[in-house]
């Protein structure tokens, strides 16, 4: 930041500190304990829409909010007051305010208000309603009270925060000047409530599981590691809620879910944040086909509640979330896109050579045809799946917690839901055979010992739970942040997380 700008900001802050001191000496704040509002700005706008131009309504109202703009013209002034619900104009008339001040009914005079209260300050006012000759509903102020003095200027109301990263670092400023950002987080809150309500209405029970875990499992991801001092024990922030929710199914809860935070020590992008929110759902006596139906019903219902329809627009593209959605197997989609039939490949070298021949990158760490199939899908297919598509039947090598397919050797009963080229949900017919599960986790542990930091370890307590007996179960995980991105037309996950993790700011 240029030195001249820093100097100007420092001078402005000093001026505002002087005003704060002046208000304090007048007995008016500058930091109040409380204020009793009779209405929100939205209530006033809605309830008095019939007030004609030039008319007053002798109804005393009290309203509080932040001063967004101010215009002082001699003995008149006009302020714009904003609260969470909207804005309203304050009509400030010297004679009216000074008359109230002389009767000791108010906290200050017109001159004190117009010289000591700046844009950014929080104030509470009491007055009557009038509609100006220009048609603007206004509160004709009689009394005013400073509630909190702002020592920093607001961003320019016309240009907002031009620096996108500053919007994320100082979200409070972004929310002040951007109605779109406020609407995004309002929709997020409504969406989370709607998801919980939908599940609760269908007899699913939300039960919290540990965030700190002795063994990180339930996903192929690197965990964050911490340490418990009293127990002298390494612990991990959870990378999924899956294994503990399955324990609850073993214990007799037939419909269970948890909506909460997940932590993965991985890269950041427009689609990834190390701390994110998911909902995992488990239903006894169900399989992955049942979970497809549940996913369609849940997402389409919530979309209708939040967006008003199952047809929405995302980044200029119309998306139709009306069920039923397309279903296609991974190997069929790859074959359509590349001409390669991975189900016919029995040899890793042959599959790798075929991938290279059609221009696909062959990762050096791939050690099976199944992993190459998944790699080909990610490179050649994933971004093309714009309309909601269930991608079915994944390779067993990349799905250690999913049940083997009932009729397709080498595959598991798993789907991922893709919308606008992004994975939005993941589900299995859950693996409930404890012996099969042990073999797969031991294979994962061998991969981890060989250097794969995303591979699972062996969770002996989870295996013990499976040996007690788990009923046939369908499991589902939905990424809340990506769903919010879709429902709010947001291009980056940072737009829908109030305080995303960012790189340290460079000091100049």
From Swiss-Prot:
Any one cellular-component term (Gene Ontology): cytosol
Cofactor: Mg(2+)
UniProt KW keywords: Aminoacyl-tRNA synthetase, ATP-binding, Cytoplasm, Ligase, Magnesium, Metal-binding, Nucleotide-binding, Protein biosynthesis
Intrachain S-S bonds: none
Enzyme class: ligase
Catalysed conversion reaction: tRNA(Lys) + L-lysine + ATP = L-lysyl-tRNA(Lys) + AMP + diphosphate
Superkingdom per UniProt: Bacteria
Gene3D superfamilies membership: Bira Bifunctional Protein, Domain 2, Nucleic acid-binding proteins
Residues that coordinate or bind Mg(2+) 2: 423
GO biological process: lysyl-tRNA aminoacylation
Entries under Pfam families matching the protein: tRNA-synt_2, tRNA_anti-codon
Database matches in InterPro entries: Aa-tRNA-synt_II (IPR004364), aa-tRNA-synth_II (IPR006195), aa-tRNA-synth_II/BPL/LPL (IPR045864), Lys-tRNA-ligase_II (IPR002313), Lys-tRNA-ligase_II_N (IPR044136), Lys-tRNA-synth_II_C (IPR018149), NA-bd_OB-fold (IPR012340), NA-bd_OB_tRNA (IPR004365)
The EC number(s) this enzyme carries: 6.1.1.6
SUPFAM superfamilies in the cross-refs: Class II aaRS and biotin synthetases, Nucleic acid-binding proteins
Binding site for Mg(2+) 1: 416, 423
Cofactor mode of binding and number, as noted: Binds 3 Mg(2+) ions per subunit.
Protein's cellular compartments: Cytoplasm
GO MF term list: ATP binding; lysine-tRNA ligase activity; magnesium ion binding; tRNA binding
Main location: cytoplasm
Annotated PANTHER family: LYSINE--TRNA LIGASE, CHLOROPLASTIC_MITOCHONDRIAL, LYSYL-TRNA SYNTHETASE
Family: Belongs to the class-II aminoacyl-tRNA synthetase family.
Subunit-level organization: Homodimer.
Name this protein carries in UniProt: Lysine--tRNA ligase
Gene expressing this chain: lysS
């Amino acid at each position: 930041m240029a030195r001249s700008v820093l100097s100007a900001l420092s001078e402005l802050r000093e001026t505002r500190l002087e005003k704060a001191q002046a208000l304090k000496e007048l007995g008016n704040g500058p930091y109040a304990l409380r204020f009793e509002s009779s209405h929100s700005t939205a209530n006033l706008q809605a309830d008095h829409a019939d007030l004609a131009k030039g008319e007053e309504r002798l109804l005393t109202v009290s309203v509080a909010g932040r001063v967004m703009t101010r215009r002082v013209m001699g003995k008149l002034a006009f302020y714009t007051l904003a609260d969470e619900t909207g804005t309203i104009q304050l009509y400030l008339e010297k004679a009216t305010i000074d008359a109230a001040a002389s009767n000791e009914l108010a906290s200050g005079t017109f001159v004190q208000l117009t010289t000591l209260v700046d844009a950014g300050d929080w104030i509470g006012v009491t007055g009557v309603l009038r509609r100006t000759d220009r048609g603007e509903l206004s509160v004709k102020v009689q009394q005013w009270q400073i509630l909190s003095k702002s020592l920093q200027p607001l961003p320019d109301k016309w240009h907002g925060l031009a620096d996108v990263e500053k919007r994320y670092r100082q979200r409070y400023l972004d929310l002040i000047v951007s109605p779109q950002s406020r609407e995004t987080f309002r929709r997020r809150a409504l969406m989370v409530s709607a998801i919980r309500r939908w599940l609760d209405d269908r007899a699913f029970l939300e039960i919290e599981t540990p965030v700190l875990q002795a063994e990180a499992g339930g996903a192929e991801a690197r965990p964050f590691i911490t340490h418990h001092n009293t127990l002298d024990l390494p612990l991990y922030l959870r990378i999924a809620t899956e294994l503990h929710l399955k324990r609850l199914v073993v214990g007799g809860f037939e419909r269970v879910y948890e909506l909460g935070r997940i932590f993965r020590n991985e890269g950041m992008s427009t689609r990834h944040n190390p701390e994110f929110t998911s909902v995992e759902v488990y239903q006894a006596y169900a399989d992955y086909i049942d979970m497809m139906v549940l996913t369609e019903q849940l997402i389409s219902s919530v979309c209708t509640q939040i967006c008003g329809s199952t047809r929405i627009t995302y980044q200029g593209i119309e998306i139709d979330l009306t069920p039923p959605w397309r279903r296609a197997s991974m190997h069929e989609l790859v074959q359509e896109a590349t001409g390669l039939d991975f189900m016919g490949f029995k040899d890793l070298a042959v599959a790798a050579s075929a991938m290279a021949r059609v221009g696909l990158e062959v990762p050096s760490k791939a050690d099976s045809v199944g992993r190459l199939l998944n790699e080909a899908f990610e490179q050649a297919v994933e971004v093309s799946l714009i309309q909601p598509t269930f991608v079915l039947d994944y390779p067993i090598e990349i799905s250690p917690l999913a049940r083997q397919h009932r009729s397709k050797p080498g595959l598991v009963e798993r789907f991922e839901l893709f919308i606008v080229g992004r994975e939005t949900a993941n589900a299995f017919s859950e693996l409930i055979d404890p012996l099969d599960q042990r073999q797969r986790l031991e294979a994962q542990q061998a991969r981890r010992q060989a250097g794969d930091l995303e591979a699972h370890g062996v969770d002996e307590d989870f295996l013990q739970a499976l040996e007690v007996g788990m009923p046939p179960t369908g499991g589902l995980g939905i990424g809340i942040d990506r769903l919010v991105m879709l429902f709010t037309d947001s291009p980056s996950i940072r737009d829908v997380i109030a305080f995303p993790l960012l790189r340290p700011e460079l000091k100049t």
